[in-house]
Amino acid sequence: MDVRFPIGKLQVPEKVTIEDIHEWLKQIETYTNRLGETVNSLNDEELSKTYREGSWDIRQLVHHIADSQLNMYQRLKLALTDESPTVPAFDQEKWAIQPDTNLPVETSIKMLEGINERIVSLGYRLTEEQLDQSFVHQINGEISVASKVAKLAWHEEHHLAHIKIALSNNSGS
């Protein structure tokens, strides 16, 4: 297994259906509870564990998940409200070292709870036509609403797997 992609790379079907969207939304809907069950009782030493040498530690991963969902949610909303808006990339490495990432992981879990609730509420009301609406990412190009919902689900699961790998490692890194 490649620990960088423990659940594999994101794969989006060529033709995404409303059923696909609903499956991804079910994952997003339960994610905050599953993440909380995994990290809420961890001490500082455990939160400092990494899944591979040079990777973010568990604390940074939890904050990154919230930061990313926030950015992706905003992009999703822009794709639904504007005509092919261009969105900037965000420098996740710089976000990961900002002072707010020293807060307890519970702050990001609370943030995720609200963002994911909004994503799920919006997602269950998407129409077939809306799945093809898109935004233009300044680096990655055109991204459809359907692909963004897939990534919203995949990205969280991807990092939950990283956290579980870090916890199974015996060393601090």
UniProtKB/Swiss-Prot annotation:
Transmembrane segments: none
GO MF annotation, one: zinc ion binding
Location of this chain's protein in the cell: Cytoplasm
InterPro entries named in the record: DinB-like, DinB/YfiT-like, Put_metal_dep_hydrolase_YfiT
Binding site for Zn(2+): 64, 155, 159
UniProt cofactor note: Binds 1 zinc ion per subunit.
Family stated for the protein in its record: Belongs to the metal hydrolase YfiT family.
Subunit note: Homodimer.
Protein name per UniProt: Putative metal-dependent hydrolase OB0413
Protein species of origin: Oceanobacillus iheyensis (strain DSM 14371 / CIP 107618 / JCM 11309 / KCTC 3954 / HTE831)
